[in-house]
Amino acid sequence: MAKKYVYYFGDGKAEGASNMKELLGGKGAGLAEMTNLGISVPPGFTISTEACVEYYKNGKHYPPGMWDAALKSLKRVEQSMGMGFGDPERPLLVSVRSGARASMPGMMDTVLNVGLTTKTVEGLAAKTRNDRFAQDSYRRFVSMYGSIVMGVPREHFEAILKQKKAEVGVPHETHLDARHLRELVSNFKALVKEETKKEFPDEPLEQLRLAVNAVFSSWFGARAVTYRRLYGIPDSWGTAINVVAMVFGNMGETSGTGVAFTRDPASGDKNFFGECLMNAQGEDVVAGIRTPLPVNALAKNVPEAYKELEHTYKKLEKHYRDMLDLEFTIQEGKLYMLQTRVGKRTGIAAVKIAVDMVREGLISKQEAVQRIGPEQLAQYLYPIFDTKEESKSNPLGKGLPAGPGAAAGKIALTPDRAVTMKAAGTRVVLVRQETSPDDIHGMNAAAGFLTARGGMTSHAAVVARQVNRALTVQVALTDLV
């Protein structure tokens, strides 16, 4: 019997479960478990970590039967959604996301909107009666695929986008209309051709295959390797890949995306805590490029979806008996859950959450003690500002506290500079407009860091809480000049 490498989930049933994290990765196991619990999850399938290990053993070739099994599962997704992958009238689009067994926030790659072509983008526009949405999805896809799969520097796409906003005279891309976005797609494709000497792929299955290759390859990307070295994660584990039917947070003002924690990851308070963006896609929140809204803003914008989100997070926390990190998308008022995992937290939050969960009868005292590591207890000894002196001070800037403690040091404006300064014996504070997962080496070298953009749920904030670094986000950097 052929080895099983692909596990389907959808329509309330999944071939996996939460206890299969080693095989399905954390994300895949979470998607399977939420599906089995009857929570609203888009259909999809997980390619196992074993497939990734075999991919590298075989000289970057898929193990026997993997691709055929993936295509069979894709057919099941098509049937569930009533759409076709590559169908010019009812196009199914998918996301291709990494998911290792150990959480590695932002360290590997994700590609959204796979399946968009010159034909399917017109079908998407006609089906949704929303040309702007279709063109916005296409320009996002070309830039993401172009950078992750085809190796064009992300900054080159951002420069073209910045130039277009300046031409039109708008502050943000949400103000660009369908015509402007079509022009961006053309400009992005021209950039890809110029940089790679290749045409942007216009065949959906080719897009999918190359996206899967790119996500497998990101397991040995520089930032993923650095992260694994820091946290003792073996190279031999490999990553799973989740191919999931796209749901869209960028379809208008009743659509959005967000990241939330079932309790405050900084303080441990029993408050539903998170951030969201309306008319946006998931990477917009965690990338820290745009400053998000608090998650409870959804109660006003999409009240029914917010009620369902509240019900869902309570159900999941009770089921997992831990504080959870959630990702979700709302498409025209309907909630879809995209991820659940045990949330990273500060040491102070870890102690409070453990004590509170004992009082609530969710865990035993023994479990509470086992959940607190020495590094988390050490945070109680971290330096903080003297409150009396702080009250007398005249701060140059203010922001939100996303990481533990306080820090002092000389400013470094790039991650590489932070590494160099630390090697010379200097304490460093890394200052950036926003951080990305590519900055992990500089974040580890710094005593603390601050950013102008991003929120409390961005990848930077998640990593800061894990590496025990002080982080302040949403600081007006002009105040520091």
State what each model feature region is:
Residues 1-393, 420, 426-429, 436-441, ...:
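Nucleotide/phosphate-binding sheet-loop regions of phosphoryl- and nucleotidyl-transfer enzymes
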Residues 398-438:
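Extended, non-globular alpha-helical segments
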Residues 452, 474-476:
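Generic beta-sheet signal
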Residues 469:
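Residues forming the flavin
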Residues 472-474, 481:
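Beta-strand/loop nucleic-acid-binding surfaces
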